Amino acid sequence: MSKHGVEQLPAARALTWPQRLGQYWKLVRGDRPIGSLLLLWPTWWALWLAADGLPPLWTLFVFTAGVWLTRSAGCVINDYADRWLDPHVERTKSRPLATGAVSGREALWVFVALMLVAFALVLTLNWLTVMLSVPGVFLAASYPYLKRHTHLPQVYLGMAFGWGIPMAFAAVQGSVPLLGWLLYAANILWATAYDTWYAMVDRDDDIRMGSKSTAILFGRFDLIAQGILYALMAATLVMVGLRADLGAAYWAGLGAAALLVAYEFRIARHRERGPCFRAFLHNNWVGLAIFVGIAVAVAGR
């Protein structure tokens, strides 16, 4: 253990190859798929709406693989940006960069490799999708640095996590209609809300270390702010359903999602770390409920 109470692993050069690969797997959060799922669901919402059913299989493959690649790259650059902070935060002090098991240079190479593979996949799609991928890279790479300068990194995360939505419409339809931007807005609201649950877990550590978040900004009004965010998300998804002329299955999916969100408020009402983290994880089911509603609704036309 170091003087800061951080478990120190052997230097990267002393690790065996299986150990080193294990640390890289942890670096890209291969052991924690929740982030990929939270990125996958809105991407699939967009693909199914844009195609009015099952999207072209190659397009579906590119976006599904791209979700994992870009989310993994985002985790790497986030840990690189937070390597000064993570050793002092209970939840993050065992991350590979925080312990020294992976060096900063290695992390940057992993980030570049993941983004290059993702970009190579995008190059197989139309030119508009390729062009839209450029701001997507900027959003993913710049997000981790915002927590030093603004209390709204969760909003920016929503912009980054949802960028696959306009890209999906561009890939399938060759343009991004108003429906795509409405769905993008709904995702920004959703991601801001679920990542605020996540930020509530780290709030005490973030205050101590000078990091910023919506959880700190909202303070004692956090649950009220969360309610407003989820209500605005629901209202935007209602507009999506009306504009896309979706049937009963979609509205049933929205109803199920609303009940799932209500459960999150119930378990996190005392703002304890464990329940707030469970509320964050629970949003996977919210995304799934909305996707099932969309998929069944468009299949039944």
UniProtKB/Swiss-Prot annotation:
- Which transformation does this protein catalyse, written as a reaction? all-trans-octaprenyl diphosphate + 4-hydroxybenzoate = 4-hydroxy-3-(all-trans-octaprenyl)benzoate + diphosphate
The regions listed as transmembrane in this protein's record are 34-54, 57-77, 108-128, 163-183, 221-241, 245-265, 279-299
Q: Which GO terms describe its cellular component?
A: plasma membrane
Question: Where is this gene product found?
Answer: Cell inner membrane
Q: Which InterPro entries does its entry note? A: HB_polyprenyltransferase-like, Prenyltransferase, UbiA_prenyltransferase, UbiA_prenylTrfase_CS, UbiA_sf
According to its record, how does it sit in the membrane? Multi-pass membrane protein
Name the enzyme group at the top EC level. Answer: transferase
The family assignment reads: Belongs to the UbiA prenyltransferase family.
Q: Which HAMAP family match?
A: UbiA (MF_01635)
What is the name listed in the Swiss-Prot or TrEMBL entry for this protein?
4-hydroxybenzoate octaprenyltransferase
Name the source organism.
Answer: Xanthomonas axonopodis pv. citri (strain 306)
Q: Which gene encodes it?
A: ubiA
